[in-house]
A protein has these predicted regions:
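A long, amphipathic alpha-helix that forms part
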Residues: 76-77, 216-228, 245-286, 433
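His/Asp/Glu-rich, glycine-adjacent segments
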Residues: 136-253, 342
Length: 463
């Protein structure tokens, strides 16, 4: 309740007891106003942390963690709202292919990328979610894989490890919620990579620790509950995450009935969200996108140790990311793998093609192995997935495999209607959202971003 303590302590006028007869009506009015103010603050707090039902859509959740950043600054109260929704693994063509009516309606009402949005390399979940909210390529923000090793720290980061996920020192860049909070604007994250961490000593005003079993409907309920907070407490930036399409794609492949079912389930939740937004009558821009696509895996897993790779050359191996003990060992590994198969390319890290933006961060390993097709590559038979590879996979170069391209649709008061965009890189989403929210990104503490506003500025309505 810290956010509301100043309100409780505010005194409009002092009275001495006993109260004179003429003062009674004034005191009653003041007490009425004071109690009403307290009630509104308590209601706002209850909705924020999930104690009460906000709308007819259901209950908010008690799992929300509220951080006391104070109310929205005065200059932020008139700003519009952005809800950023990620459908993990939702390939660019799923909506049309599986008749996701609500997403297709959203696309028709606003802007969309019919041929998809290009994920950063590697096209996997943690790097791309964090790229979307920082405007930086993975090698610049540091989250280069779901699991990786940092040679300087001599530590491993893993999306399966709560300690590293919540450690803000792993994360570079300035995430959108940090940007918002630093400029006096409240934010909320219903799951997003980095949102549990103390990045630049800042967390969202409202966030949750990841729980993959959390019901989708309750996620939407909580987002709508946030929109029903008082203007002072209401977040202007909200993120929302769903994993269903990715899970089904891995287990059954992108052509399966299970993926179709997941698409329909998610589309239903998007429809509920659209209806709920409309009911609020707030100026909300809804952006629904994905981190990457999905492709069916071909053949058995490719083991690099069968091509002469010697584990003794490495200080650490994480899946197929190789961390050599020395530069000489990196060169030995490169020479052992070079030209051995047409199913992968191998580069010394500094020689990785520039368009991949994967050539300067020690966390990326050295040498770097890049698949040429939908193959699962592991360092050895002990690597995760070597024995029983998934049916569907991602992580590949989107310029080689268009199946890696992701969904992007956006609609709302700031988005032009009927706009179809050519494929664009997802680093450009960050400056678009900052522009809609009126947030300044010209002098970030972490330096300039990789994304460019000019790429997507054309989908915005003229001021």
């Amino acid at each position: 309740m810290h956010a509301f303590a100043p309100e409780f302590g505010r005194v409009a006028k002092s009275y001495k007891w006993p109260i004179a007869k003429g003062q009674t009506s004034n005191l009653r009015l003041l007490m009425h106003r004071f109690l009403r103010r307290i009630s509104i603050r308590i209601l706002s707090f209850a909705l924020a942390v999930g104690c009460l039902s906000a709308t007819s859509y259901g209950q908010a959740t008690s799992a929300v963690i509220a951080v006391d950043h104070g109310p929205n600054a005065q200059q932020q109260l008139s700003k519009h709202y952005v809800i950023l929704v990620s459908l993990d693994g939702f390939r660019y063509d799923y909506a049309k292919r599986y008749h996701a009516d609500h997403l297709l309606t959203l696309a028709a009402q606003g802007a969309n990328a019919p041929e998809g949005m290009l994920p950063a390399y590697p096209s996997i979940t943690f790097p791309n979610h964090y790229t979307i909210v920082t405007g930086l390529y993975p090698e610049h923000h540091g989250i280069v894989a779901n699991t990786f090793y940092d040679p300087a720290r001599k530590e491993e980061y893993s999306n399966r490890d709560a300690k590293s996920v919540g450690d803000g020192t792993w994360y570079g860049g300035t995430p959108l919620w940090v940007l918002a909070e630093q400029q006096g604007m409240r934010s909320a994250c219903f799951f997003w990579v980095g949102s549990e961490a103390d990045i630049q000593e800042v967390r969202p005003s409202y966030y949750l620790k990841f729980d993959g079993k959390f019901p989708n409907g309750k996620r939407v309920d909580q987002v709508l509950a946030w929109l029903h907070l008082s203007p002072e407490q209401r977040p202007h930036l909200i993120t929302l995450y769903f994993s269903d399409a990715d899970t089904a794609g891995h287990q059954y492949g992108p052509d399966s009935s299970q993926v179709a079912d997941a698409v329909h389930e998610l589309d239903g939740e998007i429809g509920r969200l659209m209806d709920g937004i409309k009911e609020t009558k707030l100026p909300v821009d809804l952006i629904v996108l994905a981190d990457h696509g999905m492709v069916k895996v071909e053949g058995a897993a490719i083991r690099l140790d069968q091509y002469g790779l010697n584990p003794s050359w490495f200080a650490q191996i994480v899946d197929s990311i190789l961390y050599p003990k020395s530069d000489d060992d990196a060169q030995r590994a490169y020479e052992a793998l070079r030209g051995k198969s047409d199913k992968f390319l191998v580069y010394r890290r500094a020689q990785v093609p520039g368009y991949l933006h994967f050539d300067s961060n020690p966390r990326e390993g050295d040498p770097v192995v890049v698949p040429t097709g939908p193959y699962l590559i592991t360092a050895s038979g002990d690597s995760r997935g070597a024995e029983h590879p998934p049916v569907g996979m991602h992580g590949y170069d989107a310029t080689r495999m268009p199946e890696m391209k992701a969904l992007f649709v956006a609609a709302g008061p700031d988005i032009r209607s009927g706009v179809a965009m050519m494929p664009f890189e997802n680093v450009n989403v960050y400056p678009l959202i900052a522009k809609i929210l009126g947030l300044d990104i010209t002098n970030l503490k972490t330096g300039p971003i990789d994304g460019k506003l000019g790429v997507l500025e054309g989908i915005l309505k003229s001021d």
